[in-house]
């Protein structure tokens, strides 16, 4: 198989949820779409600049102690519950469901992520390689107002309602009820990735590309100008997904 982060990657790269790497501790369940920590597979080192997608569930009262990052754009999308963040730059606060946090590690930053609540929390942590290394660390957190059946910008360097990272990529979040459908957003880059947070969808393609359905935890990388997916429809009562336009 051609590694998905190779410039000559195939038309479609399908990552079924059950084939992801799984880490399990007494306080953490983590599903890794790409190689991470002790899980290393040269065929799954990332997809273009998209280096990490981890689906983490953290038990109440537990979390990650202080640890360091460098030269990586780190995005945390809270799906359920809340998480307390603190870092070496003096930033601290609680990230709640619906919030998105952006942390540019740059020349180096240390941070902790602790679930101080009485309920488990679930989040998606995303790592994106920056276009330039050695930038100063930066931090931002926003509440993303979600409207069903609408692509909501999360990352977009040209949209003041969204955040931006040190790479010209776009990221949208979409929620659909059962039977609702929507056209894909305009994808201007040669690579795109869909990640299902919850629910099930069908995807229409002018080229009859497969798979035609995605389910919770599935990921799909594709070339927009060749796969030519046109429309997404929800097959479940509550569908929640992310769409990346990767440069």
Q: What residue spans do the PLM features occupy?
A:
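Jelly-roll (double-stranded beta-helix
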Residues: 1-247
């Amino acid at each position: 198989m051609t590694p998905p982060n190779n410039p000559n990657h195939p038309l479609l790269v399908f990552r079924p949820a059950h084939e992801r790497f799984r880490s399990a501790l007494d306080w953490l369940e983590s599903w890794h779409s790409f190689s991470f920590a002790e899980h290393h597979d040269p065929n799954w080192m990332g997809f273009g600049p998209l280096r990490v997608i981890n689906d983490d569930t953290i038990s109440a009262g537990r979390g990650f102690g202080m640890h360091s990052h460098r030269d990586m754009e780190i995005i945390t999308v809270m799906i359920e519950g809340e998480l307390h963040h603190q870092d070496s730059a003096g930033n601290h606060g609680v990230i709640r469901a619906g919030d998105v946090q952006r942390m540019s590690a740059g020349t180096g930053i240390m941070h902790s992520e602790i679930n101080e609540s009485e309920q488990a929390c679930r989040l998606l942590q995303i790592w994106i390689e920056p276009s330039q290394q050695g930038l100063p660390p930066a931090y931002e957190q926003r509440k993303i107002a979600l409207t069903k059946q609408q692509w909501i910008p999360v990352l977009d360097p040209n949209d003041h309602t969204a955040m931006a990272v040190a790479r010209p990529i776009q990221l949208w979040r979409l929620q659909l009820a059962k039977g609702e459908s929507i056209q894909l957003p305009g994808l201007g880059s040669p690579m795109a990735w869909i990640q299902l947070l919850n629910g099930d969808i069908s995807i229409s393609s002018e080229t009859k590309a497969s798979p035609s359905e995605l389910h919770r935890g599935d990921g799909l990388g594709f070339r927009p100008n060749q796969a030519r997916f046109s429309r997404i429809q929800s097959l479940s009562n509550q569908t929640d997904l992310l769409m990346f336009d990767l440069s």
